[in-house]
A protein has these predicted regions:
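Sequence-level preference for short, compositionally simple segments enriched
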Residues: 1-214
Length: 214
């Protein structure tokens, strides 16, 4: 089961972040009824819509596998107007965490197919505290203003020997991503993980007082 939540104000809270687990294994290249493929924005394990979403003390993971085989595979599509995550594990490979909104225009026909494809692009504010986020290609991406506070960022080894942590698509005049007092440590070979690359022209991402391994 893949929860799709569209409420004004709600809380998801587990008893233990390592024992309360939401899991699914849907990849963007999986077939979709009547269509060629699922696509990135229908691959989520958990969809957070609505007004204010609070998520605490649990794990959300997408176990579809490596993006080279299954395509993008979201653990969380964070699309609520305000998102707060505390003590949450987000595990995946390519495109683990999407922080809405989408860019205005897609580059591939039907590339945004999903719940928000034809919706207005509404700005969101997101805050992640003491979270563990794992992936290998563009695994934190999107157009939100988002703060990552004392989080552990875990870039995973990828067969291309290159890992990109972020891919912001920050709208003009928005702040983008801020990582504060975070630890970046994974299993990539030395010097193969990059802090980010732009998904759109105004992409913004800042790292402050973070600890980076080789």
């Amino acid at each position: 089961e893949r929860p799709f939540i569209e409420l004004e104000d709600y809380v998801l809270e587990g008893e233990d972040r390592d024992k309360t687990i939401l899991t699914a294994g849907v990849g963007g290249r999986d077939p979709w009824p009547g269509e060629e493929k699922t696509g990135t924005f229908r691959s989520w394990t958990l969809f957070l819509g609505g007004g204010k979403a609070v998520v605490k003390n649990l794990t959300v993971q997408n176990t579809a596998g490596d993006g080279a085989r299954v395509g993008q595979a979201l653990a969380v599509c964070a699309d609520a107007g305000r998102v707060l995550m505390q003590g949450v594990n987000l595990y995946g490979n390519q495109d683990t965490l999407f922080t809405a909104p989408l860019p205005l225009r897609e580059r591939e026909k039907n590339g945004f197919r999903g719940p928000r494809q034809d919706s207005p692009r509404l700005n969101t504010e997101q805050y992640y505290q003491d979270c563990r986020i794992r992936g290998n290609i563009d695994f934190i991406f999107g157009g939100a203003n988002a703060v990552f506070d004392h989080c552990k960022i875990e870039p995973l080894h990828h067969k291309t020997q290159t890992c990109y942590i972020t891919a912001p698509s920050t709208p003009p005049e928005r702040l983008g991503y801020l990582f504060v007092d975070c630890i970046v440590h994974g299993d990539c070979p030395p010097h193969t993980a990059y802090l980010g690359r732009p998904w759109r022209a105004d992409a913004a991402c800042y790292w402050m007082d973070c600890s980076l391994s080789e």
